[in-house]
Amino acid sequence: MRRRLHKTTLLFFISIGLITLDACRKKYYATAEDMAEYGWVMYETQDYLTSNTWFNSAVSEDVNWMDGYNGLGWSYAKLMVLDSSIDNFITGLGKPQDKWNPTDIHSEILAGLTFAYHAKGIDKKTIEYGRAFLDSTVRPLKAGWVFAHDSLLNYLDVRITLAASYFSVGKFDSASLNVQIVLDSLNSSVIAVSDTSLEGRKKMAEQISALQTSLLKQ
């Protein structure tokens, strides 16, 4: 009979390469969930190549494991293999989320797609997935989204990325609106630049860039 180990114990065995054990004639095995969880352990230590390997193992074990594709998307993005990142995120969107997983994986994938498309300079797709992310996460009296595997990354990073892409496609009013939301969320007294003259656009671009840099440190 096959049984699962306690999560902490199993992750330890995975870490030293013992995926299947035979003790007292009981088979203990690592599931796709376990492999994905260990992939996130590696991701959080910034070992993105190893984490990517474990996420690949997770989706090989269970082709419907949504969080495995989520992890592949994020780890490929960190490795700057952006096409593979996007492909896995999109595949993950079509998979069912495990009802016992408290993490909103769907929103993590939408955020990941926003960042990945922005890194590729595809602003229309950045806006498409950024707006889908906001539709998925913005609720009255609900705390803003924070990435479960990097607390420095949150909904404000998505907002400012969205603002940058709006600016790039010439939708300056939308860019300014998102900048103001970020500033208000930071309790800043600064007003978003709304002047769309040539000089105003230059200042708007500088404001967006400064906020992107500042948010990376918070």
What name fits each language-model region?
Residues 164, 168-218:
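Terminal, low-structured helical/coil segments at or just beyond the last alpha-helical repeat
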Residues 30-57, 61:
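Alpha-helical segment of the N-proximal tetratricopeptide repeat
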